[in-house]
């Protein structure tokens, strides 16, 4: 999972704590509770109009869609702006030049605050939520990184195929019954089963259940609670929700404890992530993960390892259904590359270059980890004009960075996978596409997620024609991560795939795509 964080920046949540940068290890000062302390010339940064005393920039704000509020303000105020609520002020960045400046690892580091800090009661100092000064980040990273090597990925591939086969079996049954499929719900089942099987040898039997597995319900509860903390001045206002969150955390922990106990009682697995957590020592120090840290890492991987990928797949399928020319071109590539093979081999997935472009373009328009925070390692000047004190931080709005016209052109809201053609990528400035975060603390499971999602898109395109609901308009649910809400789709079973053309080139080269149904608008939710 990318280093996503809460998306409002208008919280009464926990203050940041002392941190260090991964490169220097030098302790940074206590994180600034409000931007006034860390930005000496804050008044030069624009803020929304109609600011209220004490309350701040709350007029027109929605507790349910804080990201889309921030996107609206971004379109109005420019590439850097600030928001204030309940006595705290925060700086947001989305301009591609400023974001590239903050990607400089010699000057900036990951900042753990807002939504990420709100998850620490769930997973403590696990990979995703550890403060930079906490040693367990480096320990876990070094122990677990080999679990995402090419050799490890090739070993996961057959299990990914098995889970995908359960998805298509479920979709075949829905198709036979004349029902539309629940895309986000089924992608969540798929990706949970995939990370559970490949990483921990566990089967949640998600496709055999009429309702979501209780683990998913508890996970959604904890993510939603972490997001809600960003919208109130004090957790005391969420007493009932806090009790529910405590119960959700307890269920997550019990589930993981049972999973670990079963592995220990069974005498080990096949060298998966859980085996690494339990049995592998650090290659240099010989240190091992503690029992508490193992629990935290397992929860992190089960949650982060499927939540963002399910959203990415759901958005990609949404855009494929709306753009039949794109779907035809992607499907032709699958037929050509995979041919008559009953199941694709590991190496064949990476050859689906156009399918991968479709996935990247969906992640551009709706990065499921929609923001990440960066803090200054030393006093510096952002973009040559905004002084920052050491420890000051800003929230990079990935969802708006990915639509910056300076980087992506005047049609940045339009779905067009050819933006990720190799020549187009080379011509574009660096640090303009950040769905997995940036730097040393970027998503450790990036290649896992991309392989899984590309494989699944290829399998679904090979098997089905996708038909959108003509009445559906994209609505986006925010719970730290993003997911299309209520997306259902009709399927048509494909006839046998045509014989690939002798030239080996894909058919259906039409470049035309369906534009978003609204012109460029800061709020990219209604009508996509």
Q: Where do the model's predicted regions map?
A:
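N-terminal membrane-proximal hinge/A-helix region immediately C-terminal to the signal-anchor transmembrane segment
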Residues: 2-6, 17-125, 135, 139, ...
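Cytochrome P450 heme-thiolate monooxygenase catalytic core
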Residues: 21, 31-43, 111-118, 136, ...
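Cytochrome P450 proximal C-terminal region
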Residues: 24-45, 74, 164-168, 217-221, ...
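Cytochrome P450 I-helix active-site segment
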Residues: 39, 47-50, 157-161, 216-218, ...
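Conserved cytochrome P450 K-helix E-x-x-R motif and the immediately C-terminal K′/meander segment
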Residues: 57-78, 258, 342-383
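Cytochrome P450 catalytic-core helices
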Residues: 308-326, 331-333, 447-463
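Conserved cytochrome P450 K-helix/beta-meander segment immediately N-terminal to the heme-binding cysteine loop
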Residues: 396-424, 521
């Amino acid at each position: 999972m990318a280093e996503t964080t809460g998306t409002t920046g208008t919280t009464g949540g926990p203050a940041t704590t002392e941190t260090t940068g991964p490169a220097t290890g030098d302790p940074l000062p206590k994180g600034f509770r409000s931007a006034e302390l860390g930005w000496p010339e804050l008044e030069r940064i624009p803020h929304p109009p109609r600011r209220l005393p004490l309350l701040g920039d709350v007029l027109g704000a929605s507790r349910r869609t804080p990201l889309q509020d921030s996107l609206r303000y971004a379109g109005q105020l420019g590439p850097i702006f600030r928001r204030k609520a309940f006595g705290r002020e925060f700086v947001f960045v989305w301009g591609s030049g400023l974001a590239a400046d903050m990607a400089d690892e010699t000057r900036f580091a990951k900042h753990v605050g807002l939504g990420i800090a709100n998850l620490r009661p769930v997973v403590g100092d696990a990979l995703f939520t550890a403060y930079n000064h906490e040693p367990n980040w480096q320990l876990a990273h070094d122990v677990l990184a080999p679990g995402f090597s090419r050799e490890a990925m090739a070993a996961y591939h057959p299990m990914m195929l098995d889970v995908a086969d359960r998805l298509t079996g479920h979709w075949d049954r829905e198709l036979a019954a004349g029902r539309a499929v629940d895309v986000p719900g089924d992608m969540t089942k798929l990706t949970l089963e995939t990370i559970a099987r490949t990483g921990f040898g566990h089967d949640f039997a998600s496709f055999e259940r009429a309702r979501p597995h209780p683990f998913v319900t508890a996970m959604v509860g904890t993510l939603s609670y972490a997001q809600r903390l960003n919208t109130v001045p004090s957790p005391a206002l969420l007493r009932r929700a806090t009790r529910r969150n405590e119960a959700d955390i307890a269920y997550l922990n019990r589930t993981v404890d049972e999973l670990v106990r079963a592995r220990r009682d069974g005498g080990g697995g096949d060298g998966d992530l859980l085996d690494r957590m339990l049995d592998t020592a650090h290659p240099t120090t010989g240190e091992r993960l503690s029992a508490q840290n193992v629990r935290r890492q397992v929860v992190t991987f089960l949650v982060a390892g499927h939540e963002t990928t399910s959203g990415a797949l759901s958005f990609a399928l949404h855009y494929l259904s709306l753009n039949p020319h794109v779907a035809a071109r992607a499907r032709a590539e699958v037929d050509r590359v995979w041919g008559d093979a009953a199941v694709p081999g590991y190496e064949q997935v990476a050859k689906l270059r156009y399918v991968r472009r479709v996935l990247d373009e969906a992640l551009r328009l709706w990065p499921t980890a929609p923001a990440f925070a960066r803090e200054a390692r030393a006093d510096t000047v952002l973009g040559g004009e905004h002084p920052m004190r050491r420890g000051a931080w800003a929230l990079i709005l990935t969802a708006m960075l990915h639509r910056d016209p300076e980087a992506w052109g005047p049609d940045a809201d339009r779905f067009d996978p050819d933006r990720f053609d190799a020549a187009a990528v080379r011509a574009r400035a660096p640090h303009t596409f950040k769905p997995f975060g940036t730097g040393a603390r970027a998503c450790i499971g990036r290649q896992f997620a991309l392989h899984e999602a590309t494989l699944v898109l290829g399998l679904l395109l090979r098997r089905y024609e996708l038909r959108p609901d003509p009445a559906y308009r994209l609505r986006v649910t925010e719970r730290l991560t993003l997911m299309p809400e209520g997306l259902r789709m009709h399927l048509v079973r494909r006839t046998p795939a045509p014989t690939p053309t002798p030239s080996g080139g894909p058919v259906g080269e039409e470049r035309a795509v369906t534009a978003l149904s609204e012109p460029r608008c800061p709020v990219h939710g209604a009508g996509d």
